């Protein structure tokens, strides 16, 4: 049931302030209640002089049919999934592949993902769309 995919839109990477984000794929899984979930993978690069984590630097949301998806809690996570990856501090110049899981509203509509700098007045976003339907 694990599926790796590349973004269906070419603009899945960019710079947000002193951070770089590149969406690298997704995996379908089930959460602890058996609900369908999508695990979004992304590279987070810290170009700030202070060590920080993706969770502190970025806000990442996922949408289906224009409606925000809830975060998912996985107990039987697929291989390669690290629920704590976005909480790990990384130093200047380092890049870490992180994952964030969301509960799907359905398994046919595309999933749109947006990343933005958490504490910023900029409206810049890095966006990506995944066509998850089989």
Protein language model features and the residues they cover:
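The feature marks short-to-medium sequence segments in extracytoplasmic or secretory-pathway proteins
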Residues: 45-96, 131-133
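Short edge beta-strand/loop segments characteristic of extracellular beta-sandwich folds
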Residues: 41-45, 101
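A structural detector for beta-sheet-dominated domains
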Residues: 17, 22-24, 29, 55, ...
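N-terminal Sec-dependent export signals
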Residues: 1-16, 28-31
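Glycine- and small hydrophobic-rich membrane-insertion segments that are intrinsically disordered
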Residues: 1, 86, 119-121
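Short, solvent-exposed beta-strand/turn "edge" segments of beta-rich domains on protein surfaces
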Residues: 25-39, 50-52, 89-91
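Short, surface-exposed ligand- or partner-binding patches at beta-edge/loop junctions that are enriched
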Residues: 96-129
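Envelope-exposed proteins and targeting segments
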Residues: 15-24, 36-40, 56-58, 96-98, ...
